[in-house]
Amino acid sequence: MSDEKKTKKGLSKALKMFYGVGDCSFTLMTNVESYFFNFFLTNLAQFGLGTVSFITTTASVIDACLSWIYGAILNSIKPKKWGRYRSWLILLPWLVPFLYAFQFIKLNDGPVGVAVIIIAAVASHIVWNFPYVANVSMIAVAGKTPEDRSQLASTRAAWANFSKVIFSYVATPLAAIFAGIIGETNQYGAVAFVLGCVMAVMYYVHFRMFDGYEEIEVATETTEKKDKTKTSPVDLLRSLVQNPPLIALMIADLAKFMFNFVCAGVAVYYFTYVAKDAGMLANYLVITNILCVVGSYLSKNLAKKLSTRVTAIVTFLAMAVVLIAANFTYSNVTLVVILMSAAQFGYGIAYACTPALYADTIVYAEWKTGKNATGWISGLQNVPLKVGVMTRGIIISACLAMANFSADIDPAAASVELQKGICMAFMVIPACALIVAALSLLIGFRLTKEKVEQYQAEIAARG
């Protein structure tokens, strides 16, 4: 026999309101890298541009190449004490602050100093990706119905986007405090350590909130029940290649992240060379970040009325229309800010929808293959994210090159050709990506709410 702990049914009030505080702190922590890693390498550590390029490229390529592996490992190894996924919310996060801090510490100008930064960057990402994937996997574990999964995904997205607002007020003052204590060069190392500690604490909060939601089975000698949550490499491959909705969703997710990263990266060029008022960027970021939070929070209400799939499709198409309209009125800065802010509101909705859609593909995969590949499929969400980051530089650089951009150009003398090239990256290409996302879901993602509920009932009937 096996000693099997009964799992809770229905979401607790804590999960409905506070699931996502770990994601909020996680994003706060990773934003130190997003906003200050290059600045640390060039201005504080004062490495040459060639060295900086080597460090960032090496770390990002390794990170991207490993992005698929975390879910596969979680699905394939023996479950830990507190469950296959929930256990990882407490096992590794405490190591992250110590590894992450060294990514922003300069030991010397030689190869040892460079090696320490690269190793710290790669190691910290490996360590935090396991709990990150486990955390997302818990949406499918705790969310027994499409409504529950939509609720969890929406709350998580709202908290994650709220971190952008917090970061804009916290990061610089915190860095200034540590600069006065340990010096300017390593100030971001201290910020990374502190925010890494906050992340570990908040992941522990998630660990506590999910208590009782994941089945924990202690096998004995007479146990004959096969663990359906443990998968072989063949099982994992089948869960992907025999899962057309998952492939369609990953394409749509990549397009979504392309929109986010490209628009974020090119915004400074728009306000500098088209609006000719770089100071507007700060206000634009505050407005769009707040609207992202609002969109994320409201997504669950839309999903209840339209279904998560339909909400995502309609949102992607609406965002594309808004971006195209912004391109036609690119010289009207106020209108562009309004339209781009509306698009970011839509991004908040789409960001909240996609984890719930991944959870639906997990149900489909188990129905199709007989194996529960929750960790593997949840971990695959990392792939569009990492590829999206890589496409950002390619798209922005290509558009600027076609527009004959030069850093020596006076913003006041920016040509129409340059302005249109910037708008191509800011509006047109993201709009095209969003149309692809909508079509991918419309054609390839045929999982309706009714079908998912039917598959769940059939899985339960199998025992």
Where are the language model's segments positioned?
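Membrane-embedded alpha-helical bundles of multi-pass transporters/translocases
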Residues: 2-463
